[in-house]
Amino acid sequence: TKDKADSFNVQPYCIKLFRQRWYMVARGTTPKYFKMGPLIYSLDRIAEIHTTDTTFEMPEEWSASDYFDGCFGIIVGHDCDILNIKLKATAQQADYIRDLPLHESQVELERNDDYSIFGYRLRATYDFIQEILHNRENVEVLEPKSLRKQIKAVISEMKEKYKQ
């Protein structure tokens, strides 16, 4: 952890709630940070925040819905394509997923006594992969094969760590 707090100005674009935490999407005003574009800051990690008299023009082409399009949480992952993902969930886990959808694009494609299949349109970012793994053996990636292979690789690494 960092002991020294940084102080800097930003142009706030929007705030987003994810997993009971608030985040601010903002663009830094110094040349180094301005050229990086909007970044995401966790509000609970900000020690002090205040307004200034400085104003800015919100870019007309920027929208929060476009910025977070296909995102599971707050990891934007514009370097990842938006995929059509199919997850198979045990009947018990499917009840939970129905009550608390994993993503706004969630559609139940199939349902029977043993399992349900859910479809999503999103990016396979780190936080979505964590969510799949969080569901343990109760959820299986059916499509795309590339994501299934990625999950399998993570599980194999985990298995190696617990070999002994």
Task: Identify what each model region corresponds to.
Residues 1-85:
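Core beta-strand-centered patch of the WYL/Sm-like small regulatory domain
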Residues 67-164:
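Polybasic (Lys/Arg-rich)
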